[in-house]
Amino acid sequence: KLSSYLTADEIGLDIETTGLDPYKDQIRLLQLSSRDAPNLLIDAYAINNWIDLLKPLFKSSAIKIIHNAKFELKFFYHLGIDIKGVIFDTMLASQLLAAGYQLKHKLSDLVERYLSIEMDKSEQKSDWNQLELRSSQLAYASNDVEYLIPLYDKLRLELRHNKMRKVAKLEFDTVHAVAQMELAGFGLDRQRLDQYLNQLAAKHQKLETEIINKLGPINVNSPKQLKEALFKVGIILDGTNREVLNQHAELPVVFNILE
């Protein structure tokens, strides 16, 4: 079955993991789909050499169609796996096309929106660490790659129609770097951070004391109490959000609240 994937032009790729942290959790299943072969599920617990087995596929020039590719790539990079070829991220494509609209971009949302199919996600949070997976889990995992290529076809046409292919390519090309950056993280001086947080806490306490001295014993985190207390000292406001308070920032007590 795997040999047919090595000559495919496009491959749907997904993984099921035991959790969300590539440093602590493991890949349990890898799922593949293509136009000309049945979906392929690879049990990483049962096949110890799955990385070597799939290396030719990872290195192939086939377009890798992945939903939220950054997640998969972080797990792969942690294991020393480099994915070659173009990545088409269905989640990023959907987000680009929906810019300005309050739409959801989970895989099930896209499948329903573009393919009019409702996915069963009941196994999404099930136990993927058990030695024997249930048939319902395997069906769920297969379903996750079943619709990637049909989505790719729909989204690619939408991107072309909206003249967004170049910006989409730019987004897809950055996924590798973003995944590597998030996986690597950055160094942090914990001692200096703790010192800074203590300074902020002291400043916050000082400002709160000054506000209470001006307005009386109130909960400064309560917009209702704050508005009433300001009214009592002659400061009439429509609300206590930052936009309204900024209009009166010249007043010392309001300045302290903003700080």
Q: What would you call each of these model-derived segments?
A:
Residues 1, 93, 107-110, 193, ...:
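Hydrophobic/aromatic residues in well-formed alpha-helices
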Residues 1-15:
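N-terminal accessory regions of nucleic-acid-interacting proteins
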Residues 7-9, 60-61, 214:
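Structured helix-beta-strand junction loops
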Residues 11, 86, 141, 186, ...:
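Short conserved micro-motifs on helix faces and helix-strand junctions that flank
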Residues 16-20:
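Short beta-turn/strand-loop junction motif enriched in small, turn-promoting residues
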Residues 21, 25, 29-160, 168-172:
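Active-site-proximal helix-loop-helix substrate-binding element of RNase H-like nuclease domains
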Residues 151-259:
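Conserved "right-hand" nucleotidyltransferase catalytic core of DNA-directed polymerases
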